[in-house]
Amino acid sequence: MALRPEDPSSGFRHSNVVAFINEKMARHTKGPEFYLENISLSWEKVEDKLRAILEDSEVPSEVKEACTWGSLALGVRFAHRQAQLQRHRVRWLHGFAKLHKSAAQALASDLKKLREQQETERKEAASRLRMAQTSLVEVQKERDKELVSPHEWEQGAGWPGLATAGGVCTEGAAEEEEEAAVAAAGAAGGKGAEEEQRDVEVVAAPVEAMAPPVEAGAAPMETQFPHVEARAASMETTEKLERILLQLLGDADQEKYTYWGQKEGDLRSVETATSYFSGTTNPWSRASSEPLPVQLPASYSYSYSSPFSSFSDIPTISPPQATVTAPVPPQLPSDWEAFDTSLWSDGGPHRIDHQEHPRDRRYSEPHQQRPPVYRRPGDWDCPWCNAVNFSRRDTCFDCGKGIWLQKPH
């Protein structure tokens, strides 16, 4: 008996059906043999063998019928086995789906935890950033308080820095002016101690009031101090200072005045300090010894009476253009050796008292040389009195004659 009713893998659930199929296969011995031989094969191969048997004409009909019933039993068995495999696959897919679902839930939980962690970290970072910004603002405020510029501090304190700086910067110039004023007052001869002290104070006061030199790279004084416009009047102070010096030095000898002309370079420091406020600049190059051309009006004529008229005749000239050069000192008689032809005053030649000015004797000795006169570009020598004048002056501060006048021949 090929089919067994107790075999669940046969695919048949009823025993009478199994008995009927076994009876049909038992009509020929080939029926049960065909069933047992092909029980492990696939349905396609079983069908191919059955087709070969049915097409063979030499095979009897009983064999063909028994093989056909065996093929039917194998087909049911293969169908039952395929159903079992399908159920196993479905159960596996259900389990796999559950696994995916649980994995997705776990991933969602992890993602939620990660988002919460990131949000917490973001809030902490934002809090630290705000604290850092607050600390930075406080540090900047402390730095600004510590790094307040001296000018801003002077603004808050009533501008004490200008007077202090002016006193420091002009201290050296003031001392030199005082020494020069004392020497000039001593040369005048007719003044007492009180008058000399008063003259020195008058000379030194405008110098100390001058503005200090401005350092390179410093900000413009107009933007630092509100009272810069008042400093513009320092030019007038300089003019007054020169007039005072001329009055004090009116009776001094030419050597004294020549020495004072050499000290004019010291007065340059004061002029430089004032020229900053008036917007003028002085170059620091060497002075040229070339003649200075001066344009004169075409219709101008001037007749000048020289104090040395006994030595030369003064013609009347009216040139359209003149050249001012350093004049050659006139040749004086031998009996004039004891005199100094100073043109700084209107008194003419004066007798030099060597006992009155002992410290100026070093310039009269032949083996001593006068210190050089320091010049700047544009400074000019007066053709009449040989005094050195600043480039900004149009008239000689000694004799009062203009640069545009032709020197008498």
Swiss-Prot record:
Keywords: Metal-binding, RNA-binding, Transcription, Transcription regulation, Zinc, Zinc-finger. Signal peptide: none annotated. A zinc finger (RanBP2-type) spans 376-400. Zn(2+) binds at residues 382, 385, 396, 399. GO terms for molecular function: mRNA binding; zinc ion binding. The keyword Zinc applies. Testis specific. Belongs to the TEX13 family. Interacts with CNOT1; the interaction may inhibit CNOT1 binding to mRNA and subsequently CNOT1-mediated mRNA degradation. This is Testis-expressed protein 13A. It comes from Homo sapiens (Human).
